[in-house]
From Swiss-Prot:
Pfam families (UniProt xref): EF_TS
Involved in Mg(2+) ion dislocation from EF-Tu: annotated segments: 79-82
Organism phylogeny: Bacteria, Pseudomonadati, Aquificota, Aquificia, Aquificales
Domain of life: Bacteria
Organism: Hydrogenobaculum sp. (strain Y04AAS1)
Keyword Cytoplasm: yes
Gene Ontology molecular functions: translation elongation factor activity
Record's signal peptide: none
Keyword Cytoplasm found: yes
Recorded family membership: Belongs to the EF-Ts family.
Database matches in PROSITE patterns: EF_TS_1
UniProt protein name: Elongation factor Ts
Length: 273
């Protein structure tokens, strides 16, 4: 049957599909816009599966805090152009709202793919991503997310390229903000030496001892040299042992303790890492 140009235009606005695809879908659906949308969606999902293996090095980080809970999400895509797209940002924030409302404390970043079966307005997140891939034309993936419970603070830098979410105890919000900025700038990987996994410690020590051995250091000094380098590792990689960027005479632990603030945990996301 013949379809009107108005309906083709309307379907294009609703789905983001090409004019010819919209015309064919309407003809196949005998002019029924809802059926045509479903036809396009099915075809779009097939296209989306083909794009799913393409690299996603760009994206957007979004975060939201309430007094009792905070969440952060990284939605990945292929190009910076798409990362700035309004519908991409809208999708990121939809997923963020779902995570904030439905996911408990993740105890750090999570990449658990079971979240993709969660439903937003009756449609799974997996289906929403595939629809976005079909509409926008790039691979789009939910890369990771983080949830903290209790008092929290979130900070987004560089238009969504870096995100920080931390949980804390205390009343000095200025100190908490300073710590969030520290995390964004200095890239700590762990909260404290006590939270560094044992396998990471053993790996670092082995590297340091091997380096010292190759430099011709005495065998009986290797352990001591490795311990010294491990101390430097803690100063670089653990938040509480880092030097405070606003006053390098203090560590973050010194600064927070002096102001009755306790940092309980944090997540740091950066696009491309």
């Amino acid at each position: 049957m013949a379809v009107s140009s108005e309906n083709v235009k309307l379907l294009r606005e609703m789905t983001g599909a090409g004019m010819l695809d919209c015309k064919k879908a309407l003809e196949e659906a005998n002019g029924d816009i809802d059926k045509a949308k479903e036809i396009l969606r099915i075809k779009g999902l097939a296209k989306a599966d083909k794009k799913a293996s393409r690299e996603t090095k760009e994206g957007l980080i979004v975060a939201k805090s309430t007094p009792s809970k905070g969440a952060m999400v990284e939605l990945a895509c292929e190009t910076d152009f798409v990362a700035r797209n309004g519908s991409f940002k809208e999708l990121a924030n939809k997923i963020l709202d779902y995570v904030l409302e439905n996911v408990g404390d993740t105890k750090g970043e999570s990449r658990d793919s079971s979240i993709l079966q969660g439903k937003i307005d009756g449609i799974t997140i997996e289906e929403l991503l595939k629809e976005a891939i079909a509409k926008i034309g790039e691979n789009i993936q939910l890369k990771r997310y983080c949830v903290v419970e209790g008092p929290n603070f979130s900070y987004i830098h560089g238009g969504g390229r870096i995100g920080v979410l931390l949980s804390y105890e205390g009343d000095n919000l200025d100190v908490v903000k300073d710590v969030a900025l520290q995390i964004a700038a200095m890239r700590p990987e762990f909260l404290s030496p006590e939270t560094v996994p044992q396998d990471v410690i053993e790996r670092e020590k082995a590297i340091y001892m091997e380096q010292a051995k190759k430099e011709g250091k005495p065998e009986n000094m290797l352990e001591k040299i490795a311990e010294g380098k491990l101390k430097k590792f803690y100063e670089e990689k653990t938040l509480l042992h880092q030097k405070f960027i606003k006053d390098e005479k203090k560590t973050i632990q010194d600064y927070t303790k002096a102001n009755n603030v306790t940092i309980k945990g944090f997540c740091r996301f950066e696009i491309g890492t």
